[in-house]
Amino acid sequence: MQNNCKLIIAFIFLFSTVSAQENLPNYMTKKEVLQMPSYLQHFSNQLKNNQAAVPPSSPVRTMAEWEELQGILIGWTSYPSILREIVRAAKAECRVYIVTNNQQSVINYLNSGNVDTVNVSFVNTPFNSVWSRDYGPWSAYTNDVDTLVTIDWIYNRPRPDDDNVPVAIAGILNTPLYETTMPPYSLVHTGGNFMCDGFGTGFSSNLILNENPSLTESQIDTIMKQFMGISRYIKMPTLPYDGIHHIDMHMKLLNEETILMGQYPQGVADGPQIEANLLYVVNNFNSIFGTPYKVIRIPMPADNGAYPNTTGDYFTYTNSSFINNTIIVPTYNISQDSTALRIYKDALPGYNV
């Protein structure tokens, strides 16, 4: 074996926990919409790491989020108060890699909140935004648990520095890097729209189809199988009010057999489509163990009494993060927070919530 105890997972974890957007948002700006075609054309012309964009030669297994990990990745630019609390909780569980262009400023900010830098490493590489869960690398194993490798997709935003962060991380970790960046393996994808059970079942919204119009669904499935070991790829219609169409905004795998699914009041906002998607999954698929999926519901919180179909921002409790024995859950200083935390605690006994 080699590298199996390095950085078991090298992407992560930020929640949309405040209403005001700072710096680049998680969606594409109007300018970026115009830039996207030329950004994608870039990947027809050259590789990011000057290596062949081919899948691993051995079978691949992408780990589930609840498996043991030794590190998480944070891009430090927006929402520093939230990031500091993530670091505070995460550094007790694993090493925290912080991408920043101003290490001392981050250290000073952490220290001002009584957070030291024990178990914290700094990555000095260019980046564009805070959304590391979406642009960061994915960790997988060849031959089940043998060699740790890094998988990198084409990021679905025209933010080239963000898109290069996985290359930098693979270099720091000294892991083989496999990129879906050149035909016939070109694939545009984003971390917030993918989750898996560690046994070859993956979930996404149909955004994965919409953002790869030159590929058939079968071709997308083949790429995910070759690069990530996904042998069963479950896809669901996008939601009308979730502008970024990431499944982590309304869904969370808690283990191989349990789905945490957001729930709106009947008929409100994305509620009808969420219910339809949930019925599609439970009526057509069992867990990897052949058992029906257990479904736990969690409220989709209102923003000052309003939901996304009126004037409310898109608040969610499903966009959480496993970090070994801890799970970090977004909260909003509203009454539903206590209900959401109780649901997580009941569903995950033994975890720090």
Where on the chain are the PLM-derived regions?
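Bacterial Sec-dependent N-terminal signal peptides
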Residues: M1-N23
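The feature marks the mature, well-folded catalytic cores of soluble enzymes
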Residues: Q21-V353
